[in-house]
Structures are given as C-alpha cells and as structure tokens.
C-alpha cells in the first residue's frame, strides 16, 4: 500500500511498486526505439503535479533528459523545478543563521529531498481514512 498514515500517496513508496518500475522500463524501451515520448499532466504548474514531483525526479535518476513544457510553451528542466521547490520551501536558505555558522545547516541536497517530500504531502493523491469497526 502506497498510502501513509496521513492518507496520501507516499511517492517514496510508489517508486518501489512493480507497476511503477514496469512503467519506467516501458519508457526506456520506447526511448531505445527512438520514440519521442511526451507525458501529460493535469496541472499547468509542474511543481504542483506528480509528473514532476514523482515521475520527473525518478526519470532523472534513471538517466532520462526531462523537460517540462510550461503553459506558455517554454521548457524547464527538472533542475529548474528543483530551484522553484527550494524557493518555495526554503526561501531563506541563503541567509546567515546560527546553524550555518555552526555548520549545522541543511545541505542543498537535503533541502531538495525535503522539498520533494513537502510537495508530495501537498499534492499526493488522498484517500479517506477507514475507521476501525
């Protein structure tokens, strides 16, 4: 089950599912055949859509060249979307703080990981919790 106790789909669990892995393999096969593959999402803003937060991140890990077609027609890379996530969730990341002075500040990589988790929490498909009978 990919749903966590809070009732939303946990993308860290989804990526471990056989169906998800098979889907990634199908994309690899299609690319190996030189198909031009486009994945459509429901949201105009990719950072609000699982295609970027779930799929885009995993496709980058698998070596795909991921570009998001924006509403206006321009393209954004997954790296550019990660910058947007950092700006949204860690807008004060470049400020001098006691933690940064003491060497306890989060690394950029950790902030990106946390940003994906926070975005997942916001956009993950939700189900009603079943009450124990």
Where are these regions (language model features)?
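Residues lining hydrophobic/aromatic ligand-binding pockets adjacent to catalytic sites
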Residues: 1-133
